[in-house]
Curated annotation (Swiss-Prot):
One of its GO terms (molecular function) is zinc ion binding. This is Probable M18 family aminopeptidase 1. Its EC number is 3.4.11.-. The keyword Electron transport does not apply.
Length: 458
């Protein structure tokens, strides 16, 4: 199924529209790098667009714009549709978390008069890619009195950055050079250099004490306070255009913030009341299996759908309404997929692999080997999506995750399908996924926005 490169047929006006849309996305992904930051941004923008806190409303009716928030990391936005909600909803679900490093509960140590922050990697990273890379420290810490302190260090002009120092090639022959890629550095050694100046004292660990003193002076944070913290270490720096033609975007966290951004913008831009209730659901913890109380496996979806239906049905409410609403719904698992990387093309079945710049990929299934752990969308749903995209002149392509026995992976699709929701994976293709600098196409970004908006409208 060969297709011409879609860029060729675009007018200058269409190209400008795509490039202009991409500029705001670049600003977004440069600034908001953690799940808390993304959730906060989404809530702030939703309020400006007229969305109200559903927990404070007693009744809901068609056209109402509402939001739900779960522990400052997971958020849902809904526009109540014209049709009875038990006839089904249209959901787009993306995730706010990205692979990163997390600080350990007792993280600060001194070794050879240098101070390090000990970490535990989060999600599927290639550990060696994080060596000698400028890093930013972000997150929240609760002090012993319960006060919340937010930190964001490494991305402002006058901020320091932080580094995991690599070994020089002159001395790496025995310790590193002949090892497998996942053994180049042990997870326990992903320690971030954060200080080197000592303090004048008779105590040991003079540099650690000096670093802790600086942290306390600026942020009121003491060493024990790290126990009640969520400190995330992410790549420093901003999104960049890639290539002379500037048609690609390089940035950290595009898995899955490219889908977060496009699903948000598309629901915010709906001009008319949709036929079916439209839901934009941004969830946490996808990169580690959707676990925890803010992950999709927590049943928060069932909670807020039940609350919506109760406020619509009032005295007529019963649990069967909830089950019917979920069972009759359609969902897009809005997550990125792996584009063909010409340097490593052998891992793909090229006939079934997406390319950068060919539109939004439709991925019927993910999983491993024999489709293990996949939700595997039914042909009827794929047909519906295909017709929807064609009807709206939206560029699309097919996608699978590599050759059959090459590897594999999963998304939130199986958790949505567990409610009986008909679900398909559909998100832009990415090169260098899970790296500190992921690459996407501006054309695919814009067509994801168009596709999600068309889906909400139905």
């Amino acid at each position: 199924m060969k297709k011409q490169n879609p860029w060729i047929s675009l007018s200058e006006e269409e190209k400008n529209q795509i490039f202009n849309f991409s500029e705001n996305y670049k600003k977004f992904i440069s600034k908001f790098k953690t799940e808390r930051e993304v959730a906060s941004y989404a809530l702030d923008k939703a309020k400006k667009k007229g969305f109200l806190n559903a927990e404070e409303k007693k009744n809901l009716m068609p056209g109402d714009k509402i939001f739900y928030t779960c522990r400052e990391k997971t958020v849902a936005f809904a526009i109540i549709g014209k049709n009875p909600i038990e006839n089904g909803m249209n959901l787009i679900v993306s995730h706010t978390d990205s692979p990163r490093l997390d600080a350990k509960p007792s993280p600060i140590s001194e070794e050879n008069e240098l101070v390090f922050l000990k970490t535990n990697y989060y999600g599927g990273i290639k550990k060696y890619q994080w060596l000698s890379t400028p890093l930013s420290i972000r997150g929240v810490i609760f002090l012993k009195n319960g006060e919340k302190v937010e930190i964001n260090i490494g991305d402002n002009e006058n901020d320091p950055v932080f580094i995991i120092p690599d070994i020089l090639p002159h001395l790496d022959r025995k310790i590193q050079r002949n090892k497998k890629s996942d053994e180049i550095i042990e997870g326990e050694n992903l320690k971030i250099l954060i200080g080197s100046l000592p303090i004048e004292t008779k105590e040991k660990n003079k540099v650690k004490l000096a670093t802790l003193q600086l942290i306390k002076e600026k942020y009121k944070i003491e060493e024990e306070d790290f126990v009640s913290s969520e400190i995330e270490i992410v790549p420093a720096g901003t999104a960049k255009d890639v290539g002379f033609d500037k048609a690609l975007i390089g940035a950290y966290g595009q898995d899955d913030k490219i889908c977060v951004y496009t699903s948000l913008e598309s629901i915010f831009d709906l001009e008319e009341i949709p036929n079916k209730t439209a839901i934009c659901f941004l969830v946490d913890k996808e990169e580690i299996g959707s676990t925890g109380s803010t992950g999709l496996d927590s049943r928060y979806l069932e909670y807020f759908v039940s609350d919506m239906i109760f406020k619509i049905k009032k005295s007529e409410y019963n649990n069967l309404h909830v089950q019917k609403a979920l069972w009759n719904s359609k969902s897009i698992s809005a997550d990125v997929c792996a584009a063909i990387n010409p340097l490593f093309s052998s891992v793909h079945d090229e006939q079934n692999a997406p390319k950068l710049g060919y539109g939004i990929p439709i991925m019927k299934y993910t999983g491993h080997g024999g489709k293990s752990m996949a939700s595997d969308a039914d042909a009827e749903l794929v047909s519906y999506i295909r017709q929807l995209l064609n009807k709206n002149n939206i560029a699309w392509q097919v996608a699978t995750l590599g050759k059959v026995e090459e590897g594999g992976g999963g998304t939130v699709a199986k958790f949505l399908a567990g409610y009986g929701i008909r679900t398909i994976d559909m998100g832009p293709a990415v090169i260098s996924m899970h790296s500190p600098m992921e690459i996407t196409s501006k054309f695919d970004l814009y067509n994801a926005y168009l596709a999600y908006k068309a889906f909400y409208k139905e």
